[in-house]
Every structure is written in structure tokens, then in C-alpha cells.
Amino acid sequence: MASASRLPPLPALRDFIHMYRLRAKKILSQNYLMDMNITRKIAKHAKVIEKDWVIEIGPGPGGITRAILEAGASRLDVVEIDNRFIPPLQHLAEAADSRMFIHHQDALRTEIGDIWKNETARPESVDWHDSNLPAMHVIGNLPFNIASPLIIKYLRDMSYRRGVWQYGRVPLTLTFQLEVAKRLCSPIACDTRSRISIMSQYVAEPKMVFQISGSCFVPRPQVDVGVVRFVPRKTPLVNTSFEVLEKVCRQVFHYRQKYVTKGLKTLYPEELEDELSDDLLKKCRIDPTTTSIRLGIEQFADLAEGYNEQCIRYPGLFLYDYTNKLHNLEDLSKEPNALPPPVPIFAPAPTIDSADNTWSLKNFNCS
């Protein structure tokens, strides 16, 4: 019987792919990571150790899967939509001595928190305000075509502490096109700064742990890849719902090269755009001639919280879409979701007496 962290002899990954006649599908943006040294590096940077539980998204032929099992994970659940990969993954599961479970599902439609919901042996939950992280991980070498919608889905779940994040600040390690990875981690005033920069950095601390050359993949993509590790923040940096902040960020970054006021006005009907956008900028003390990439997290927090107040004052405003010329607040105010989603409320953090440990948005540095 294999030891807890050692797999029995297996065919080399290239031979494995040839054995099962696996070819990457361009339509699914599939690229196989062939170098086991790199897959082991991903598992190492994800900080997988013995006894940990792991969910892997999109294992494909199982390169990272092997590395996770070698690292000593006591349970590994893989989520794979492509039925061609199920037989080779079953081969790995048989070699893994009952540590590996296969879920033949679409990751975008899978609530990964349900995978362990009824597992009484899962690692203990850890309070969100605790400095320790749960002995759980989510890892994935994502197809490029689902990477952005999937990370938004997971960041939203983090913000509501649902899914696997009901168990605590479960870290997330994923691969992205290098340009997307840079956007996720982009500091203020960088050309790579975007909506996804704010959405990731307000609820987590993303860090690009290393880059992978496109030459390491088969077939070779036209871009390099960045591996990003996300550690959820103990306290989000914005006090609104995920949806309110996302809408503000989407509109503000819509005109990246224009003054911030131009994007902000698209949040409002034409008859209110000047009044409400001016009021919001004045309240937030933001120069209307600045650009979106020069706004920090604290300023986006002010904008989102101010816009949330306006949406409560003007029912239906949250549902307003400037591209729909038929939208009017009177009709929208009668819709079931006329008011914005409420701010998530969680147990307060333990009181900190030390002045040195006082948390402040002003101390935030996204670089």
C-alpha cells in the first residue's frame, strides 16, 4: 500500500496522455502543463502539506493532481467537465489509496462548498479573524476562457463567507493569462489597474507567486501564465455588498482614459446624472478630473458606500442600466430587487487594544 504522500509507480505524464489518446481542445482553451517540476512548484506555493484537504478545478490529465497527492493531501476532490479525462483521473484515484474523488461537473456551475458539506472528517473550521488558515485549499490550472468568470464567482463567495469559505479563510491558488494575473495584483496608478484589481484586493490579498513560460504547455499558448495565490482578508476593505462595488467599478473603469466623472455618470438616469455624480464626488472628496487607475481602494470604498446610500434613497437606481433607454426609476422601483443587496453582517472581530495593531484603510498598500 502506498504511503500517505507517495504514489506507486505511474507512467510519465507524456506517456499517460499518449496512453489515453488525449488531445487538448482549442475550443475549451485547454493547455496541458507537462513539466512535473512546475506542477510541484504550484503545489508548494499553494502551501499544501500533509493532512490538508484540497479541491482542484480543471485537473485535465492530472499533472497538478499528482503534485498535490505527492505533497501529502489527505483528501483531494477534482472537478472536471471533460469526460475524456475521467478514465486517466480514475487511474490516478486508484493509485491514490482512497484519497482522491472525482466530480464530473462544470466548475462554473459547481458549488464547491457542497463537496465537503456532509464530510464529518473534514479539517476544523477556523474563525475568520484568526491568523491561522484552515487546512484546506482550492487550486486550479484554469482554461483561459473560464478563468475570469470563475475568479469573480469565488471572490463573491469569499465576500459572503459561503461555499468553502464558510470554513474560514481558505486560500485559493489559480493560473491565469499573465495579463490577467497582473491585473488581479495591480497597484494604484498602473496601466494594468482595472475593475478586477479592486474586486480581488478588497476581499483578498492576491500575490503572483511565479510566472510560467508558455513553452511549458502543450499546445503552447501565445501568452505566458501567472500563478496567483489569494488569501482572504480578515475584514473586507469595502463596507457594501459585492454587487454594489462591482457595479461601481465596472462603470468607473468603463472609460479608463477619461475623467472619473464620465464613467460615474453612467450609474444614473440622464435627468439625475449631473446632480448625483457631483454629490457623490464631493462627498468622497475625489477630484472629478482624476482617472480610474489613480483611485485607491479607500476611494472606491467611499464611492461604493456613497452610491449604496443613493440607491436606498432612490429605489430602483441599483437596477438602472444606462444602455437600456427604456429604464426609468419609477418602473424599476416596483421590481423585487429595487434596493441593493444588504451589506453582509458577520461576527465582529475581537477588540484590539494595542494602538500599533489598529487597522486602517489608509495603511492599505496593494503593491
From Swiss-Prot:
EC number: 2.1.1.-
Transit peptide: 1-16
Keywords, comma-separated and alphabetical: Methyltransferase, Mitochondrion, RNA-binding, rRNA processing, S-adenosyl-L-methionine, Transcription, Transcription regulation, Transferase, Transit peptide
Disulfide links within the chain: none
The keyword Transcription regulation belongs to this UniProt entry's keyword annotation: yes
Binding-site positions, S-adenosyl-L-methionine: Q30, N31, Y32, L33, G58, E80, D106, N141
Lineage of the organism: Eukaryota, Metazoa, Ecdysozoa, Nematoda, Chromadorea
Major subcellular location class: mitochondrion
Cellular compartments annotated: Mitochondrion
Function: Probable S-adenosyl-L-methionine-dependent methyltransferase which specifically dimethylates mitochondrial 12S rRNA at the conserved stem loop. Also required for basal transcription of mitochondrial DNA. Stimulates transcription independently of the methyltransferase activity.
Protein's name in the database: Dimethyladenosine transferase 1, mitochondrial
PROSITE patterns for this protein: RRNA_A_DIMETH (PS01131), SAM_RNA_A_N6_MT (PS51689)
Coiled coil: none
Cellular-component GO terms for this entry: mitochondrial matrix
Transmembrane segments: none
Taxonomic source organism: Caenorhabditis elegans
Top EC category: transferase
Single biological process term from Gene Ontology: transcription initiation at mitochondrial promoter
Family, as annotated: Belongs to the class I-like SAM-binding methyltransferase superfamily. rRNA adenine N(6)-methyltransferase family. KsgA subfamily.
